[in-house]
Regions:
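Soluble FAD-dependent oxygen oxidases
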Residues: 23-505
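Fungal secretory targeting signals
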Residues: 1-27
């Protein structure tokens, strides 16, 4: 720690000794107080009166309007610590913002928060002795995966968006096309480097309480400086990208198709190397899949499923394309895999709901029929566009218990996503979220009636849930442990920074 940094922390600390009148003035104008403190500390920052504010507060999610007090742009660890000092002096929460994608805008924090942009933390390094990759807290999916592939011919599971923040999507569960046989991005993590609320840097390794908490609730405990993950060499140089067209099915046939896929996935005929995303918004009902086993075996592997689907709809068809492994990565996550920063931000005004189904409570045909009838078939809006899918999970999750990570995802079999995008990208209908919640409610009721607990997905946070609902769906019985760990690593609640952050007990 150099003397300049020490002097700057001292200068910031003197603000704690300011007169009561000054403290009162700071409380009345938190943004100005934060800007003054950050400027004194030598950390670049913006507040709402600055010309770049609109650009800096633009995220992927357009439905939720963000309102932080200030954003700091630290260029190194010392400046992250100074940013934390300023936030504590102003008695405001801190929200680390990774790659600034922020699917549900939670990266921009609660109103009045200090957002710490991690954009400068975009380094990547590879340890050939362990085959582990370390990436900064501000990296995007595309550039990191391309670096790893171009330089080392290796891969690790990741979400299906090249521009998405890699750290945030990985600690939020993450689910990708190779997750059935390699695990989720979160399952592949080896360690995380945190800066805690008081500027202390901790390397939390697998097996530690803090690492466990990071796997599903990472943004609630500190600033992620870097993340280390295990990597894998593909078994084959090529992979098979395939599509299934189930045709124009009614709700009964659509439900039967889902159960046919489920039965196939649980049979000895389905290898973990096969992934499938099946459409919820239809008809027609289609699937996009990826096969990472021996390409020569694909026709034999898929045959039992094709036979089952043809028995439901005689017009069911399968088409396939064999691609070099990296080309498959681009097919999965988009052209941004070959572009700086993973391409462009884009964005929509949308509301997402997500549920996971486990092997302990697989879908019944009646439940699947309720899902289709109450959502995509019942949908009747002209100001919203429906969207939805069922990701086949299963695979290696059979060996995971809910208590293994903060996010309870043991034995997950399906990841179901149901959402609606506003036709007007600048706003969302006032009754839109209520309408969409009403559509999925019969399916939720059917799950509960069948004895299944409602489970969610961290990366697809349902912003309209109460604390009792989201804590149960995401963390289950792990929630009490998470709150206890909060008292150890964030006793001042600095990182109680959004609606679904882990609170103090």
């Amino acid at each position: 720690m150099d003397s300049t940094f020490s002097l700057r922390r001292l200068a910031v600390a003197t603000l704690l000794c300011a007169s009561p009148a000054l403290i009162s003035a700071q409380a009345e104008n938190k943004a100005a107080a934060l800007q003054s403190c950050l400027t004194t500390a030598g950390v670049r920052n913006v507040i709402s009166t600055d010309a770049t504010w609109a650009d800096e507060t633009t995220g992927f999610q357009k439905r939720i309007k963000v309102d932080p007090a200030a954003i700091s742009f630290p260029e190194n660890k010392d400046q992250v610590a100074l940013s934390l000092d300023c936030a504590r002096n102003a008695s405001t929460s801190v929200s680390p913002l990774g790659a600034a994608h922020s699917f549900q805008a939670y990266g921009f924090g609660n109103p009045g928060s200090l957002v710490i942009s991690m954009a400068a933390f975009n380094s990547v390094s590879f340890d050939a002795a362990t085959n582990r990759l370390t990436y900064g807290g501000g990296t995007h999916v595309g550039p990191v995966l391309k670096y790893l592939w171009d330089n080392h011919g290796r891969h690790f599971p990741h979400v299906r968006g090249a521009h998405v923040g890699l750290a945030g999507s990985s600690i939020g569960g993450g689910y990708g096309s190779s997750s059935r046989h390699l695990g989720t991005p979160m399952d592949n993590l080896e360690s995380v480097e945190y800066m805690l609320y008081n500027g202390t840097i901790v390397n939390a390794a697998k097996g530690s309480d803090l690492f466990w908490a990071a796997q599903g609730a990472g943004a609630s405990y500190g600033v992620l400086l870097s993340v280390t993950t295990n990597t894998h060499k593909p078994l084959f140089e090529t992979a098979v990208n395939f599509t299934i067209n189930g045709g124009q099915l009614d709700s009964t046939a659509a439900a039967k198709a889902v159960i046919a896929i489920q039965d196939f996935s649980l049979s000895k005929d389905c290898p973990d190397e096969l992934a499938l995303r099946w459409s919820l918004s239809g008809p027609p009902y289609t699937g996009t899949g990826y096969f990472y086993g021996n390409p020569a075996d694909f026709d034999t592997v898929i045959a039992p499923l094709v036979t089952a689907l043809k028995a439901i709809g005689s017009n069911a068809t399968v088409a396939k394309t064999e691609l070099p492994f990296w080309d498959m990565e681009v097919a999965v996550a988009g052209a941004g895999m070959n572009q700086p920063n993973g391409g462009t931000l884009g964005g929509r005004s949308f509301y997402t709901q997500a549920l996971t189904i486990t092997t302990d409570h697989p879908l019944t045909e009646a439940q699947a029929k309720t899902l289709y009838e109450s959502t995509t078939i019942a949908f009747n809006r002209t100001d919203l566009r429906k969207s939805g899918f069922l990701d086949l999970w299963g695979g290696v999750s059979r060996d995971i218990a809910d208590a293994d990570t903060a996010y309870a995802h043991g034995k997950n079999l399906w990841l179901i996503r149901w959402e609606a995008n506003s036709v007007d990208a600048t706003s969302y209908p006032a009754d839109g979220t209520t309408y969409m919640k009403g559509l999925i409610k019969p399916f939720e009721d059917a799950l509960v009636a069948g004895g299944a607990p409602l489970r969610g997905f961290v990366n697809y946070a349902d912003t309209e849930l109460s604390e009792a609902e989201w804590s149960s769906r995401l963390y289950g019985s792990n929630f009490d442990r998470l709150k206890q760990l909060k008292t150890v690593y964030d006793p001042e609640g600095v990182f109680v920074n959004h609606k679904q952050a882990i609170p103090l007990p």
